[in-house]
Amino acid sequence: MDKTIKVILLMNSERLISEIEEVSADIGEPDCKLIKPMEIWEGPNLAPWMMDHTKQDTFMINSDKIITLADPTPTLLEKYEDCTK
């Protein structure tokens, strides 16, 4: 199965790049699985999302917290893949 890697803009203005999977869930339950999300900083520089708070690399979030999804540029995708090997 091919990975779906997207740039994600969250409602709190955080910009992430992550493998993302839609999962079935009950209403109100998290329905998006982020796998190895990286926060995008200026440059663009990447850092593991919530790295100061957890070693976890898989997160469940509600899709209503996502403003938009976009395809990453080839350069950003390559950088993400290098960081998540």
Place the predicted regions along the sequence by residue.
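Conserved RNA-binding domains used in RNP assembly and mRNA/RNA metabolism
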Residues: 1-85
